[in-house]
């Protein structure tokens, strides 16, 4: 038996392309318009893209289509923005799709968007989790890009069966599922903070330190769903959201006492609750 990355998630599917894979600005933009109006949708996975370059916000808008661009921007500007995940493309190029490149020129979009390249574990690329031969690289959107498994992923088909598929279109939903898990684990995070946590905790060592290829590195959900950096307690009457709030670092503090005092302290603290925060205030 198999299950997805975020198997408790509710899925909404939108048909924006024909059976041959053809789409238009009207169909993709129209889908984004529908998604914008559905409050229950938190993350939008896009396993599609435009094989073209753009070097400004206005040029990107022209390349990907004004309706698609405007509705994507609108989704990113909602009071609770929707996170957009885009496949980087499968053309073995040094730059990703135009949709990914758009993230470099629109701060509202880039705050809640992720571009995804694919790593490989088969003959389609170098074994050992390196960038798949078919995958585009992060290029100029390295700041908004991450790598995830996308080679020979066992998944369902539209015919109701299961098969192996490869491509950044398989890597993107891995990241969408990862973002859903972070949202589930840390429900108080904003969408932008969820994206930041995913990118910050990626494995960026050794091979994955090549930002032009891998952006922030290889997605690491174990790190993303556990404490980041220091564990701290908030001091006395401070407010969590106050920029002047002070904390006590738990790692750098210790407490030694006699057995009698220790027992008394344990009894006094029984049933009490202590809040502990990591470096993301979570």
Regions found by a protein language model. Name each.
Residues 1-27, 39, 55, 79, ...:
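Subtilisin-like serine protease catalytic core
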Residues 4, 10-15, 42-48, 83-87, ...:
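Structural recognition of the beta-strand scaffold that forms the well-ordered cores
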Residues 7, 36, 49, 76-80, ...:
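Sec-exported extracytoplasmic/periplasmic mature domains
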Residues 14-110, 158-166, 170-172:
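Substrate-binding/access-modulating region of protease and related hydrolase catalytic domains
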Residues 20-22, 123-126, 205-208:
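A short beta-to-alpha transition loop/helix N-cap that caps and shapes the active-site region
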Residues 29-32, 69-73, 113, 131, ...:
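Extracytoplasmic/secreted envelope proteins and their assembly/folding machinery
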Residues 41-46, 112-115, 184-281:
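C-terminal subdomain of the subtilisin-like protease fold in secreted/lumenal serine endopeptidases
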Residues 102-184, 188:
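Extracellular S/T/G-rich loop segment that most often corresponds to the catalytic His/Ser-adjacent loop
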């Amino acid at each position: 038996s198999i299950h997805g990355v975020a198997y408790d998630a509710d899925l909404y599917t939108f048909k924006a392309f024909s059976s041959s894979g053809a789409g238009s600005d009207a169909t993709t933009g129209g889908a984004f318009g529908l998604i914008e109006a559905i409050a229950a949708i938190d993350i939008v996975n896009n396993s599609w893209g435009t094989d073209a370059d753009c070097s400004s916000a206005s040029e990107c808008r022209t390349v990907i289509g004004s309706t698609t661009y405007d509705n994507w921007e609108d989704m990113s500007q909602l009071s609770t923005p929707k996170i957009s995940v885009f496949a980087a493309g499968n053309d073995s190029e040094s730059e990703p799709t135009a949709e990914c490149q758009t993230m470099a020129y629109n701060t509202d979009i880039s705050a809640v968007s992720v571009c995804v390249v694919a790593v490989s574990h088969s003959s389609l690329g170098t074994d050992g989790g390196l960038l798949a031969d078919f995958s585009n690289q992060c290029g100029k959107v390295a700041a908004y890009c991450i790598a995830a498994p996308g080679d020979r992923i066992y998944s369902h088909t539209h015919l109701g069966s299961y098969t192996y598929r490869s491509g950044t279109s398989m890597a993107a939903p891995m990241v969408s599922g990862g973002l859903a898990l972070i949202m589930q684990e840390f429900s108080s995070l904003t969408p932008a903070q969820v994206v930041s946590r995913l990118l910050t905790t990626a494995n960026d060592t050794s091979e994955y330190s090549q930002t032009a290829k891998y952006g922030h590195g290889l997605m690491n959900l174990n790190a993303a769903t556990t404490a980041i950096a220091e564990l701290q307690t908030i001091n006395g009457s401070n407010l969590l959201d106050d920029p002047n709030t002070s904390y006590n670092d738990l790692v750098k503090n210790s407490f030694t006492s006699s057995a009698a005092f220790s027992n008394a302290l344990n009894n006094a603290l029984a049933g009490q609750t202590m809040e502990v925060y990591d470096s993301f205030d979570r």
